[in-house]
Amino acid sequence: MKQIQLSKPGGLDNLKIIETDNPSLNSDEVLLKVSASSLNYHDLMVALGLIPTEDKRVPLSDAAGEIVEIGNEVTKWKSGDQVMSMCFPNWVSGAPKYELLSFIGDNQDGYATEYIAIPETALTKIPNNLNLKEAATLPCAGLTAWRALVDEGKLKAGESVLVQGTGGVSVFALQLAKTYGATVIATSSSEEKLEKLKALGADHLINYKTHPEWGKEVLKLTNNEG
């Protein structure tokens, strides 16, 4: 099978496509055929050496695919199930603990590979309304936005949400906020990107290059509530 390895952290030129054997399974693992992956800034930081990792690390934290084989102790999945990755595969339940927050793609091999053997608890079901490509974008950026707005923020219709920039978390936050009936204020330094945010539903747009005191603009739009 084909696989991408980071021969040594410190530059994109160190990413190499190699041929290697399909992985063997432990009893609690599944063999996942990776169908789609998405890139986020974490992956770039790993490749550039800004997040430490071992030589020959397989990068990428976000993916979706189909289970093609299961270990003899696996009970959660069966062959043919379509699933997606989770950012912290060792954090299964309970309060987060440092030793459980191993991030796939830097502390352990990630999804830049055709097949990966991974514990059954490291995957979750794809929502029925999403295809594999769409689901592959969710694990890190989508979940981060959800936790901030819904889980922690208890977002309600009619509230205002400020999204800064056009990174993955901001774009997901914009769409989630609109789904919940919130008013979204979006910032960027690019008029072209602001138009894309408008197309996604942003109610108010602020170019922080032409409006360097953009915070005051936000206060105006929210009756000084922020």
Feature-to-residue mapping (PLM):
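Short N-terminal binding/cap micro-motifs at the start of the first secondary-structure element
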Residues: 10-17, 41-43
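N-terminal Rossmann-fold NAD(P) dinucleotide-binding loop
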Residues: 170-171
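Residues at the starts of beta-strands that form the adenosine-phosphate
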Residues: 2, 82, 182-184
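Glycine-rich beta-strand-centered segment in the early N-terminal region that forms part
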Residues: 22-37, 47-92, 107, 127-129
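Adenosine-nucleotide cofactor-binding segment
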Residues: 163, 178-226
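NAD(P)H dinucleotide-binding glycine-rich loop of Rossmann-like/cofactor-binding domains
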Residues: 87-164
